[in-house]
Amino acid sequence: MSEYMLRCRGEEYDLKVKLHQEMNFNMIRNWIGSVTDDEFYQACDKYGIMVWDDFWLNSNSNLPDDVFAFNMNAVEKIKRLRNHACIAVWCGDNEGYPLPPLNKWLEEDVNVYDGGDRAYHANSHSDGLSGSGPWMNSHPNWYFTKAPYGYGANITRGWGLRTEIGTAVFTTFESFKKFI
């Protein structure tokens, strides 16, 4: 999820999610569960944008101080969001695997509290996904023809969903004027 989505509040999500739809995006990744606003999920439902929703783990091989509190929060998140049609994937960890016992718990939580009909993926960039990077803008054709700079080697049919990249972010107009 790009920085400009993280700065939204309330009705601003409607326009920004609509722009994603108009750009033919079909999924937004809620990186590490950064956005919690109901308006975000409502806008995604409205415009038919799927959400890849991460839990709050970030490629760090440490457990939260209280794994039981973490799990209770995960259950509450699932219950709160499960009725949104936009939720497509629940993801356990950004660029890593949730350490025991969390991975097992999160997978069970998704099955029990979300009816078991949505995907749970433990790691955001492995197990069949296209992987990390590149962390730069690329020629638009590359997103459908080749993986630049060795990222996603052996991809012959384009990238599909790249979990580690997003829409390009442009600075504010005021900052751009100062730069020029």
Predicted regions and their residues:
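An acidic-aromatic substrate-binding cleft motif
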Residues: 1-27, 31-36
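Substrate-binding/catalytic cleft of secreted carbohydrate-active enzymes
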Residues: 27-180
